[in-house]
């Protein structure tokens, strides 16, 4: 027996409102599209769903009620102008990271950088976006998660930029240092959530990989370790790093304690919060 699409969407919308009131209708559309293996626009070309399709939707709704992020359920996430495959164990890209992309694009255009390192590649959203944007760059991307590297490789192949991105397993810059990889620009959206923030995180966020979120007791552990390594490197390179507004001033103080002479620029997100810093060693 078939069930009217409109009725199913309204039912899903009402249920999802209890979890995510701001985007309930959008989530309902995306879940239906996922079950049909079509895009959102397609669902409005049909009038009915089968009982089997509705049963699948009920199971997906149960997962949402348990706090499983929508993007893990439908296995995709739109970021910038690309669609990425995502799965459990890999950080879901956020819109805030698009600020980092804009800063990186502007920097690459102005400085003509060709050799770029990304620390913590995740789903590949940053490296792939930049690789699609610039024809003549080479990106060396690393992560401490084998799952993330697997997903990033898949997404790079999907977007036909595998030849521009080389993936490494490892922490910070060590995989590149051990291979004598030369680079001009470092990009990273590192873990920066402090211990005190964890109790206040949304249930969905807590389902994402802890290693991709936790930045130590004060959220600054990654930055300290990176700056310790960079202090040994010398000059003539740039780093573009995403930060939490809560640790902005702490990171600046850490930088000033580590380095006597660096140029620091900061960039705000769409809500006016400090979200990205650019550090130039010259």
Curated annotation (Swiss-Prot):
InterPro entries: Bcl2-like, DNA_methylase_N6_adenine_CS, HemK-like, N5-glutamine_MTase, PrmC_N, RF_methyltr_PrmC, SAM-dependent_MTases_sf, Small_mtfrase_dom. Substrate binds at residues 189-192. It catalyses: L-glutaminyl-[peptide chain release factor] + S-adenosyl-L-methionine = N(5)-methyl-L-glutaminyl-[peptide chain release factor] + S-adenosyl-L-homocysteine + H(+). The keyword Glycoprotein does not apply. It comes from the Bacteria. S-adenosyl-L-methionine binds at residues 120-124, 143, 189. GO terms for molecular function: nucleic acid binding; protein-(glutamine-N5) methyltransferase activity; protein-glutamine N-methyltransferase activity. Signal peptide: none annotated. CDD domains: AdoMet_MTases (cd02440). The keyword S-adenosyl-L-methionine applies. Keywords: Methyltransferase, S-adenosyl-L-methionine, Transferase. Its EC number is 2.1.1.297. One of its GO terms (biological process) is translational termination. Methylates the class 1 translation termination release factors RF1/PrfA and RF2/PrfB on the glutamine residue of the universally conserved GGQ motif. Belongs to the protein N5-glutamine methyltransferase family. PrmC subfamily. This is Release factor glutamine methyltransferase. It comes from Dictyoglomus turgidum (strain DSM 6724 / Z-1310).
